[in-house]
Amino acid sequence: MYAAMAERLNAAPCCENLYSKKIMDTNTLGKITELEVMSYITKKGYSVSIPFGDKDRYDQIWDINGKLLKIQIKTSHLYTKNTGKAIEFKTTGTSNGRTTSYTKNDIDYFATFWEGQVYVVPVEETSSKKVLRFEATTNHPNICWAKNYTVEEVLGI
């Protein structure tokens, strides 16, 4: 499966993302993020299920010690403001051409993958985007430090 994905990576058409950096098409990039997250959680010994079809608001269901969690996977991008190293991901979806927010009824967590680590954020802690910081130029009390959102820290796995 990964060999086929690697072939697609090399042949994938590029497009411009929101930050004007060249990337492959967003659908392929999203699928890669989903695979990275699934692989990470599975390697930790937990089950991951994928819903059939496109009607569900979540991408994966994780079975963490008998508790089923609805997970929406989002691709992160390097946050480009001059505020120290951070990643950002959108916490909205698109349905019928309209931007929609997620609620606790839709999902339990957002998950993203960055530099070998899965980060999870409870849906109730988000608005239209989430920024997780690795370093900052100022020490503001509202900074969301990435280390506090690792899957290990949040879910205790």
Question: What residue ranges belong to the model's regions?
Answer:
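Mixed-charge (Asp/Glu-Lys/Arg
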Residues: 1-56, 62-157
